[in-house]
A protein has these predicted regions:
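A secondary-structure boundary/capping signal
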Residues: 9-10, 47, 122
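Phosphate/NTP-binding elements of NTP-utilizing enzymes
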Residues: 51
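Acidic, PIN/NYN-like endoribonuclease modules and their adjacent C-terminal/linker elements
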Residues: 1, 109-143
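Residues that scaffold the ATP/ADP-binding catalytic core of kinase and kinase-like folds
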Residues: 15-17, 54, 91-95, 129-130
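Short, well-structured N-terminal submotif of metal-dependent ribonuclease cores
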Residues: 1-43, 57-72, 142-143
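General small-molecule cofactor/ligand-binding pocket signal
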Residues: 42, 82, 138-140
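A generic structural signal for short hydrophobic patches within well-formed alpha-helices
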Residues: 13, 48, 89, 126-127
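Active-site neighborhoods of divalent-metal-dependent phosphate/nucleic-acid chemistry enzymes
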Residues: 63, 76-124
Length: 143
């Protein structure tokens, strides 16, 4: 899927930054296609928070402090920070009543809905949510 605007899930942002092989060629092509079309790749404040939490709990290691990593990532051409809006925060609570209960993922789903762009993720629960409710919520998953 090639779109002119994409929101990255946390693991995708980390894999993109590190050149991780888990980032499939088709996903890389979608991201590259977005860049080549002068599109925008969004990094959510929720993702920045989750990365900080993962570092703090020892689940991941970065080569530089979290705030420096985020600044470096956002300095790439075509990458834009997106704040958590009030509408997305409220919508994420509404998603609580569905089968997807992870609050971080619900916030990212709601942000993608608010932005009107696909969420690039390999999270199977998010993909299932997209398959079941994508039309209703105008939500798409790209991976």
């Amino acid at each position: 899927m090639t779109d002119h605007r994409l929101l990255l899930d946390t693991h995708v942002a980390l894999w993109l930054d590190s050149g991780d092989e888990r980032l499939r060629p088709s996903t890389r092509a979608s991201i590259d296609g977005c860049w080549k079309s002068d599109g925008t790749i969004f990094l959510s404040a929720v993702t920045a928070w989750e990365i900080a939490l993962l570092v703090d709990t020892g689940r991941i290691d970065l080569d530089i402090p979290v705030d420096a990593w985020i600044r470096r990532f956002l300095e790439r051409p075509g990458i834009e920070a997106v704040s958590l809006g009030h509408e997305a925060a409220a919508r994420s609570y509404q998603l609580h009543h569905l089968e997807h209960r992870d609050p971080t993922d619900r916030l990212l789903i709601a942000t993608a809905i608010e932005l009107g762009c696909p969420l690039v993720t390999y999270d199977e629960r998010i993909a299932r949510f997209g398959a079941r409710h994508g039309r209703q919520y105008k939500f798409a998953v790209a991976a």
